[in-house]
């Protein structure tokens, strides 16, 4: 989609970077333009009228003027600020994490309304749900699928035989779960029958349905190990927000 000289777009602020003494470069995920960059002049000044509308994971209608190298933010009006998330360290860390993933998995200026809607729905759920960890797992699994990295969960990703009801192995390199026989030639993380069932259920259902799941801490830990390994393999690095999330978990905050 070609941008006019002056344009408005709905956007979620997924990253902000300091620039100069008072400016910022904003990464904006939009439904119609994909990931775009915006220069926000003087937004870090205390008297800036825009600063409150351009916070991280804020959902706003943003006005921009097209530039040669980067577009300039000329106005912004908040649509949703997600106050419940902002009042909780744990929820804020999760919101930072899903925004970081959305940033890495969204190519610049290539519209992907499905990823935009997934991120928006996830932020809305985090702002209201009591099952934030499950909500985050839903986001991770569906983001991988929308980005072309859907893990194989029904058959061995290596030999393509139907998986048996036994301990199998999650292998990002192979593209999903592998059977014990293929584990002899491939690396993989042990994953239980129940954890595989939960992964399948999350992958195949909408977000309201996943709250029916009753998952213990052991299963959540298995899911976390497998999904993190998959994301790390795709990105070839660890998302920075995980450091904050893990530190909060260790402190039981």
Swiss-Prot record:
Name the record gives this protein: DNA repair protein RecO
Q: Which organism is it from?
A: Dehalococcoides mccartyi (strain ATCC BAA-2266 / KCTC 15142 / 195)
| Family as reported in the entry's similarity comment | Belongs to the RecO family.
Q: Does the keyword DNA damage apply?
A: yes
Q: Which gene encodes it?
A: recO
GO biological process per UniProt: DNA recombination; double-strand break repair
Per the record's keyword annotation, is RNA-binding included, yes or no?
A: no
GO terms under cellular component? bacterial nucleoid
UniProt keyword list = DNA damage, DNA recombination, DNA repair
Q: What does this protein do?
A: Involved in DNA repair and RecF pathway recombination.
In terms of Pfam families, this protein maps to: RecO_C, RecO_N
């Amino acid at each position: 989609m070609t941008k006019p000289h002056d344009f408005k777009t709905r956007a979620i602020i997924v990253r902000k970077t300091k620039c100069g003494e008072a400016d910022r470069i904003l990464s904006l995920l939009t439904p119609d333009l994909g990931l775009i960059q915006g220069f926000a002049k003087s937004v870090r000044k205390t008297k800036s009228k825009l600063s409150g509308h351009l916070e991280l994971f804020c959902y706003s209608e943003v006005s921009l003027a097209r530039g040669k190298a980067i577009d300039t933010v000329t106005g912004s009006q908040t649509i949703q600020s997600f106050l419940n998330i902002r009042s909780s360290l744990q929820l804020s860390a999760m919101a930072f994490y899903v925004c970081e993933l959305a940033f890495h998995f969204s190519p610049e200026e290539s519209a992907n309304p499905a990823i935009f809607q997934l991120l928006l729905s996830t932020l809305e759920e985090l702002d209201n749900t009591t099952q934030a960890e499950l909500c985050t797992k839903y986001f991770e699994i569906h983001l991988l699928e929308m980005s072309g990295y859907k893990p194989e969960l029904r058959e061995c990703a290596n030999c393509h035989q139907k998986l048996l009801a036994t301990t199998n192995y999650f292998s990002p390199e192979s593209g999903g779960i592998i059977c014990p026989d293929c584990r002899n030639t491939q690396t993989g993380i042990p994953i239980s029958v129940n954890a595989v069932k939960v992964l399948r259920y999350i992958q195949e259902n909408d977000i309201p349905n996943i709250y029916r799941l009753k998952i213990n801490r052991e299963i959540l830990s298995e899911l976390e190990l497998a999904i993190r390994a998959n994301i790390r393999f795709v990105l070839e690095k660890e998302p920075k927000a995980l450091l904050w999330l893990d530190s909060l978990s260790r402190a039981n905050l």
